[in-house]
Regions:
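Conserved nucleotide-sugar phosphate-binding/catalytic loop shared by glycosyltransferases and other
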Residues: 3-9, 26-75, 192, 312
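Donor-nucleotide binding loops and adjacent catalytic segments primarily
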Residues: 40, 45-49, 168, 172-174, ...
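Active-site-proximal region of nucleotide-activated glycan assembly enzymes
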Residues: 41, 52, 111-173
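An amphipathic, basic-hydrophobic alpha-helix
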Residues: 65-94, 112
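Acidic donor-binding loop of glycosyltransferase active sites
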Residues: 93-94, 255-270, 277-278
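C-terminal alpha-helical cap of glycosyltransferases
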Residues: 325-328, 342-358
């Protein structure tokens, strides 16, 4: 029986594509192992699944000064030796890395053990972890063709982003149950991602009295961010509902939405376009990120797929104005989204991984 070792973590975008691949390798009766951190979101998303989860020490690849930069190399080194032991014990036939700082020691350890490694980059520009991992990978799969110019040409394979069956086979009728049930109003889904939801939540909460005039609003605020007072004041009977997190049913919820406000992570954009959902993107600011979401948003705005509001310009007035403009041209936006080429991303990546197994 063949064995695959998956790794990725730090944000949901570095984990959910791995979940999509797990579904298919389970069907193929492969042994599946996962390497992540003990405290990252990957532990929450994968740790409770019926697969072996190996936690390793991790540092953080920062682009700014911090005293922790002096001790993190020690954690990364420890993570490398832990990964080396995992590779020797598990002996995977192939390793798939989705990115995030936890993956770097895993990729290098696999390379030392002569285990083939495939990496995947979701964003339009490669993250630091994937830049460091690329020399040790046989191939780097990319979601968007624009990413290829930043990587060695002989290693790039355009695959799209792996999307879970829960997204591609979603049921809008099931998802509708999550939304406030006021007939005649379109459903608005707002979610800020696993990180950086705060600024979006703040402005949306201020705008709620105006939003509920025109929408049934489902607001996914993130773990620990629930505003119980607001949730009670504007309950489902008044057109607004907050939830902290949606995992298994998220595909159904997304399918039921008429319009979406989202961060501009590559996986989120890919799912929105795949399901033909008119949307407004609010990219994370460069002050708290490497600017990848800003670049993602620029490209898809230029292509006509996405409407964008910069985080610095996000306020109730700009949000309401953006939604009014989007609803006024919603049919044209849907027609444009229908032009997007759907790739069998999971199939392409699975085939590439299988080719590496001798």
């Amino acid at each position: 029986m063949k064995t695959i070792l998956l790794t990725g973590g730090g944000t949901a975008g570095h984990v959910t594509p791995n979940l999509a691949l797990m579904e298919h390798f389970r069907d193929k009766k492969w042994n599946i192992h996962y390497v992540g951190s003990q405290t990252g979101i990957e532990y929450d998303l994968v740790g409770n699944l019926s697969i072996p989860y190996h936690a390793i020490a991790t540092g953080k690849l920062r682009r700014y000064f911090s005293w922790q930069n002096f001790i993190d190399p020690l954690f990364i080194l420890l993570g490398f030796f832990q990964s080396l032991l995992i590779c020797l014990r598990v002996r995977p036939d192939v390793v798939f890395s989705k990115g995030g700082f936890v993956t770097v020691p895993v990729v290098i350890a696999a390379w030392v053990c002569r285990i083939p490694v495939i990496c995947h980059e979701s964003d339009t520009t490669p993250g630091l972890a994937n830049k460091l991992s690329t020399p040790f990978c046989r191939y780097v799969c990319v979601t968007f063709p624009q990413t290829a110019k930043f990587l060695p040409p002989g290693k790039v394979v355009v695959t799209g982003s792996p999307v879970r069956d829960a997204i591609t086979r979603s049921d809008p009728d099931l998802g509708a149950d999550y939304y406030p049930a006021i007939s005649g109003k379109p459903r608005l889904l707002v979610f800020g991602g696993s990180l950086g939801a705060g600024p979006v939540n703040q402005q949306v909460e201020i705008a709620v009295p105006e939003l509920v005039r025109n929408f049934n609003v489902l607001h996914v605020v993130g773990t620990g961010n629930l505003n119980a007072v607001l949730n009670a004041a504007f309950d489902s009977g008044k057109g607004y509902r907050q939830v902290e997190f949606i995992q298994d049913e998220f595909g159904d919820v997304l399918a039921a939405a008429d319009v979406v406000v989202s961060r501009a992570g590559a996986n989120s954009i890919y799912e929105l376009i795949l399901l033909r959902k008119p949307h407004i993107l609010v990219p994370l600011s460069a002050a708290v990120s490497r600017g990848d979401q800003i670049e993602n948003a620029k490209i898809f705005s230029a292509e006509g797929y996405s409407q964008v509001i910069d985080e610095s310009e996000l306020n109730p007035a700009s949000l309401l104005k953006g939604l009014d403009e989007l609803m006024a041209q919603i049919d044209q936006v849907k027609d444009k989204l229908a032009e997007f080429e759907r790739l069998d991303s999971v199939g392409r990546i699975v085939a590439l991984l299988e080719e590496q197994v001798v």
